[in-house]
């Protein structure tokens, strides 16, 4: 029995949730999720788990076969158009046809011309294909992949934690964290999925962060710890980054500062130091981000800096996704740093406008997922 058409969004939403399990593991390929539905129930699921591994459709089909499902009676929901070319794996279209699946529901088309054409191939073989279900959500799933088709820089996730009145920390000298335990654990899981964690010099000096993933289940390599700063720290500074893991530290600084004695001492310590051009807002972050992907293979960069860095990134169009953790607390202290600051705004038309993509709870906090409008 074919699923009712009003159930298509529900099953596609399930496929999208499954797809997110692969985030950070599939680059430079996209995250893709698939579910197989029979008689109104999900009977199998699969996702693209790692780069070079089987695609979501193949994993879902394998799951269904292990469960003894009759694939000819199933509808396949997949967030991205099935690929139709030989790459590291055979075409998913051929796996679908070989399985005898007769109905496929697709979220969005593949923006990669080398892999596109799957919808036409399936239709030519007599498969019913429905496309465009939850298309905006499915396009958001591959926002990083779409960026990589046209840009040489990594996908940038800007993470901020703030109180209800927009403060990211108490005033200087006052200890305390804004977000709760669940939100902090979520951040460490996120760090395990990115190639680098980036902060500004102010955050380095004020917070002395480790910039590591300390999730108990994390077993992979640590992300690069990146600091964007016009003035480098001295090699003997009591910073956790320099004392514990200098070999994974990257400093993005000005061209002049990269030739300083401080830079030489950091290089001797095992750090990487790169000199970049400057403008009124600081060092050239766009070039620095491109360098991280080119030289260090960073497809995703998580930015956890302060309000000035955050505002500069959003204003420059370099923040592809903003992850805002909001704590149900109010500081009411004008001396406490704000989540976005440093800009001069003369009217509301100068405001940076974002689009709310999703909301989830991390009790007692909430997480807002925003994207450029």
Model-derived regions, located:
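Enzymes that bind and transform nitrogen-containing heteroaromatic metabolites
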Residues: 2-30, 45, 88, 155-157, ...
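A short, flexible N-terminal coil/short beta segment enriched in small residues
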Residues: 15, 40-46, 137-150, 242-245
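Proteins enriched for Cys/Gly/acidic motifs involved in redox and nucleic-acid/cofactor modification
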Residues: 25-26, 52-53, 119, 133-161
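Helix-turn-helix
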Residues: 33
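Zn2+-dependent cytidine deaminase-like catalytic core
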Residues: 36-137, 224, 250-257, 312-314
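Structured loop/turn residues at beta-strand edges in well-structured enzyme cores
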Residues: 69-72, 99, 151, 192, ...
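Short low-complexity, flexible loop/linker segments enriched in glycine and/or proline
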Residues: 119-121, 144-147, 213-214, 289-291
């Amino acid at each position: 029995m074919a699923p009712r058409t009003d159930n298509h969004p529900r099953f596609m939403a399930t496929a999208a949730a499954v797809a997110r399990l692969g985030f950070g593991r599939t680059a430079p390929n996209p995250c893709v999720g698939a579910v197989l539905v029979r008689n109104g129930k999900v009977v199998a699921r699969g996702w693209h788990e790692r780069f070079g591994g089987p695609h979501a459709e193949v994993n879902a089909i394998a799951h269904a076969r292990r469960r003894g499902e009759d694939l000819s009676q199933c509808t396949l929901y997949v967030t991205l158009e099935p690929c139709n070319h030989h790459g590291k794996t055979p075409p998913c279209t051929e796996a679908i046809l070989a399985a005898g699946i007769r109905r496929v529901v697709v979220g969005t088309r593949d923006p990669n011309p080398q892999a596109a054409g799957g919808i036409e191939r399936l239709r030519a073989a007599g498969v019913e294909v429905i496309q465009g279900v939850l298309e905006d959500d499915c396009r958001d799933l591959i926002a990083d992949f779409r960026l990589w088709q046209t840009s040489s820089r990594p996908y940038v996730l800007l993470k901020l934690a703030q109180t209800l009145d927009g403060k990211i920390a108490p005033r200087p000298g006052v200890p305390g964290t804004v977000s709760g335990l669940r939100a902090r654990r979520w951040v460490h899981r996120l760090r395990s999925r990115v190639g680098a964690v980036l902060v500004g010099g102010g955050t380095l000096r004020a917070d002395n962060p480790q910039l590591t993933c300390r999730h108990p289940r994390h077993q992979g390599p640590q992300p690069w710890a990146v600091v964007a700063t016009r003035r480098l720290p001295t090699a003997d500074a009591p910073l956790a980054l320099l004392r514990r893991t200098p070999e994974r530290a990257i400093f993005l600084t000005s061209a002049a500062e990269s030739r300083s004695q401080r830079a030489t001492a950091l290089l001797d310590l095992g750090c990487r130091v790169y000199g970049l051009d400057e403008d009124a807002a600081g060092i050239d972050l766009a070039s620095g981000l491109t360098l991280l992907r080119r030289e260090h293979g960073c497809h995703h960069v998580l930015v956890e800096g302060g309000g000035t860095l955050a505002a500069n990134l959003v204003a420059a169009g370099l923040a592809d996704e903003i992850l805002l953790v909001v704590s149900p607390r109010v500081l009411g202290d004008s001396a406490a740093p704000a989540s976005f600051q440093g800009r001069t705004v003369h009217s509301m038309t100068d405001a940076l406008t974002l689009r709310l993509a999703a909301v989830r709870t991390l009790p007692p906090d909430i997480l807002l997922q925003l994207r450029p409008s």
